[in-house]
């Protein structure tokens, strides 16, 4: 890994800072684990925008990632590390003795030739996957399941990690980077180590067009719009909106609680928003 600052040969390159990864595979991805991916540009089945500021961007193919890690006790060998346009983390292509290949989220410290294995008896080293009840306290983990057998849902982005803080009965207590502490069933699986590409946040895209390549459209303030487009729009000259901040649909924002799923609240011991 190396940070490279480009020469200011144009305004668009003046502020570019790239993260160079010479260890990544230069060729095409492994074809049997690649699917086509259609962009919906954040529209639902009615064609209405559900998430603003999305659309365009370069075409992508989806890499099928093994989030379940259910090849019990079979040691696999990492063939190569690859770039994945669909996530910030790198992915690793793992070859198993029976000839099957799978993509996994590449942990920090795993490289070409590394061995990874899943199971209760797996050694505690980066890339191995075990039930939380078999992981020692204080271990750094990622790729954490919320429901047994469903596959990893938490701690999957570049540089992310969590810590196994305690075990209480059928639950394991996990401390997240965000400050949240929560309970998860101890039979759920997690992988050892932290996710690769921790330098992802050090890059600088340098220009708006680089955001557009990634499918991100401009962010326009509500007070700069017309009344038909936003509750803060309109007015003579520059105005402050004339009311408490609201979303485009008129709901209060900046602190207004929108969370509905109350049934999991008893699993959260310490909220990430509370200092």
UniProtKB/Swiss-Prot annotation:
It comes from Coxiella burnetii (strain RSA 493 / Nine Mile phase I). GO terms for cellular component: cytosolic large ribosomal subunit. Part of the 50S ribosomal subunit. Forms a bridge to the 30S subunit in the 70S ribosome. The gene is rplB. Keywords: Ribonucleoprotein, Ribosomal protein, RNA-binding, rRNA-binding. It comes from the Bacteria. The keyword Magnesium does not apply. Residues 208-275 are annotated as: Disordered. This is Large ribosomal subunit protein uL2. Residues 209-219, 254-263 have a biased composition (Basic residues).
């Amino acid at each position: 890994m190396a940070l490279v600052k480009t020469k200011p040969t144009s305004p668009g390159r003046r502020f570019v800072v790239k993260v160079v990864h010479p260890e990544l595979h230069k060729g095409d991805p492994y074809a049997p684990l690649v699917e086509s991916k259609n962009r919906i540009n954040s529209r639902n089945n009615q064609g209405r925008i559900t998430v603003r500021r999305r659309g365009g961007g370069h075409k992508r193919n989806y890499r099928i990632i093994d989030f379940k890690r259910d090849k019990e006790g079979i040691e696999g060998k990492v063939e190569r590390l690859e770039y994945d346009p669909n996530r910030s983390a790198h992915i690793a292509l793992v070859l198993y003795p029976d000839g099957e290949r799978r993509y996994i989220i590449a942990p920090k410290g795993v490289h070409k030739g590394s061995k990874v294995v899943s199971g209760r008896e797996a050694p505690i080293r980066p890339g191995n996957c075990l039930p939380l009840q078999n992981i020692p306290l204080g271990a750094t983990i990622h790729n954490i399941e919320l429901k047994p057998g469903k596959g990893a849902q938490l701690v999957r982005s570049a540089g992310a990690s969590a810590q196994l803080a305690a075990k209480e009965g059928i639950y394991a207590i996990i401390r997240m980077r965000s400050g949240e502490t929560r309970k998860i069933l101890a039979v759920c699986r997690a992988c050892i180590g932290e996710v690769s590409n921790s330098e992802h946040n050090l890059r600088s895209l340098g220009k708006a067009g680089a955001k557009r390549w990634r499918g991100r459209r401009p962010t326009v303030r509500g007070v700069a719009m017309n009344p038909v487009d936003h509750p803060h729009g309109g007015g003579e000259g520059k105005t402050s909106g004339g009311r408490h901040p609201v979303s485009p649909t008129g709901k209060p924002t900046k602190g207004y609680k929108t969370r509905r799923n109350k049934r999991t609240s008893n699993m959260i011991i310490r909220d990430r928003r509370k200092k």
